[in-house]
Amino acid sequence: VIATSFTGCFGRKKSGEAFSMPIMDEPTSLDPQIADSNSEKLVAANCYEGLVRIMADGTIGKGVATDWNISDDGLTYTFKLRNNSHWAMFSGHKAVLGENYEDTFDITVKAEDFKFGIERTLSEQTGSADAPLFSAVKSISTPDDFTIVFNLSYADDNFLYALTNPGAMPCDEEFFNLTNGK
């Protein structure tokens, strides 16, 4: 909870100003789906934006999701995403994505990226510490680029809070595969 609180506290960044925060140990991975230590979770919370976030008062607020609906029985969660969220891309990506990656690689964060991220979290092969948080998830669908629907096998009052954890962060499948998951 502390890590996600820091992400919104510094809205008046001046040009050339850096934000630094001491962490207990050096993260061994920047992959949010396998973030395990407090340091890794702290880094993930400050590098990725989820569907929702925990606000200063402890309530759930908007992240990439602009709106969401929960069915009366608590088994279906539907999120609408904003269409102007983008992956940060740097010139170093040319080695992996090609010289003209800006023209060939879609940097828009889409519903499918959240679906793939949570599916990775749930995969035994990933071994994510966050997997138990999503045990209620029966299926995930993306009816369009900016809508994601979670169908749960049982009502989970903590599901929105689970979505604030690193295991729920987006992961672009094309980029993941091109980099062999690194």
Where are these regions (language model features)?
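Short, low-complexity disordered leader/linker segments with a strong preference
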Residues: 1-19, 29-32, 59, 99-103, ...
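Short, intrinsically disordered, charge-balanced linker/junction segments flanking boundaries
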Residues: 9, 178-182
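Short, solvent-exposed loop/turn elements at domain surfaces
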Residues: 15, 27-34, 59-61, 87-89, ...
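Extracytoplasmic
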Residues: 16-18, 46, 63-65, 72-76, ...
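N-terminal lobe/hinge region of extracytoplasmic solute-binding protein
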Residues: 22-72
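Solvent-exposed coil/turn segments that connect beta secondary-structure elements
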Residues: 24-27, 35, 56-57, 73-74, ...
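Aromatic- and charge-enriched surface segment that lines or borders ligand/interaction sites
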Residues: 66-126, 149
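Surface-exposed binding/hinge segments that line
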Residues: 113-115, 120, 126-179
